């Protein structure tokens, strides 16, 4: 990048020095004109303005938009350019001074000898004959070759005579008039090569860059197209690389920001500050009705018969069921109260442990030693059924104390936000506990094993997974509470690192042994038996 910038600065300074040399040459020649021609009083400022003299006064004498003048360059002995016509209708040669065309050459005779790169302006005075024609834009202008050569070569010869030892003026060369719709074409053969004492005019117009159709409007030197293109290409490549690097950096920042935001949202869900209000399945079904394609089409009830009879039958049936349930409830409550009225009775705490939990076989060894009311039950996750689990719970309760019911229960299994992985291919979600019959039957029978004499609601703790990490977890707990009515049961699933989690762990486990087991739960380097 530094090399390209220094190259551009060098090219710019060289262009400025070349322009300054041309300006000094033009001013020197203007002074020469002011001395040799008394009518030129303004020196260098009047040099290029004489071409428009006599045309500024009358608006009808303004040149047509297609008429252009050219400043031709003489470089390395080659003369390129043409004198365009200026179509002026009704203007004679005697009205006002004739326009002058100045050609830039490299002859140093008129300039000081110390100026190596001097540039002189050769004055070519021409008198053009124009034809008056109403359609001058479409008709070509015609002039005799002899008169054109005679008019142009006369001042050139007089000026060339005043120059000491200069080469022949390019305007005196052989002119080949080629009439065109727009201009006179002055085509000249190339002059012989200049002597070796003249350096080539650098950084002027490129031969390929100027065509005959496009006029040369300025003699300001242009930059070297090759080096300029190289610098431009380099800058473009640098800008493309910078844009690519900027996009990569912005993408990395966005990715890191999204990860931070996702972790923060997860943290907020875990601490419970963004707890979404629970929405039951019935409320969700009321808002949006959706049914499976295999469900039968709902039919409107036939209202031809009297519906009062059917409603009376249903109400009477519900009344009988409620009466039976109330009788059973009172009977079971009395039996449980009689069983628990003994001295030294401790309400049982049941631990239901899934074999899917890593190192679950060591969990019964880390429970509290000072609390005999804790009943651990380890079941096979792969082969056990809901009936097997319920029978094992009833058997353990009868062994502990006949007629005792569960006051507190811990379900230690795998799962995730919003679901419980109780058995193989049996995942408890808020929707499945309402649809699957075996799951509904399991939770209803489990509710009958809960205590009826407990003045506080019975508690079921969930460990091994964080159910409330998802709003569906709250929906699952709400549906389970609905299934287990009329028994008062609450579900809790606190984080283990929180204060509620520590209290839950201390209810069932020896806290020191539990932390030791937790640290070795996923380790294969040390057997837990050696630690115990």
Swiss-Prot record:
Modification Phosphoserine, positions: 206, 292, 294
A GO CC annotation given for this chain: nuclear membrane
Chain residue ranges for the region called Disordered: 34-67, 127-174, 275-315
Bilayer disposition of the protein: Peripheral membrane protein
Alphabetical UniProt keywords: Cell membrane, Cell projection, Cytoplasm, Cytoskeleton, Lipoprotein, Membrane, Myristate, Nucleus, Phosphoprotein, Synapse, Synaptosome
Positions occupied by motif Nuclear localization signal: 247-252
Compartmental location: Nucleus; Nucleus envelope; Nucleus membrane; Nucleus matrix
Lipid anchor positions (N-myristoyl glycine): 2
Biased composition, class Polar residues, residue ranges: 155-164
Family: Belongs to the NSMF family.
Record's miscellaneous remark: NSMF mRNAs expressed in the hippocampus exhibit a prominent dendritic localization which is mediated by a dendritic targeting element (DTE) residing in the 3'-untranslated region (3'UTR). Transport from dendrites to the nucleus is induced by NMDA receptor activation and results in a rapid stripping of synaptic contacts and a reduction of dendritic complexity.
Protein name per its UniProtKB record: NMDA receptor synaptonuclear signaling and neuronal migration factor
Species whose genome carries this gene: Rattus norvegicus (Rat)
Gene: Nsmf
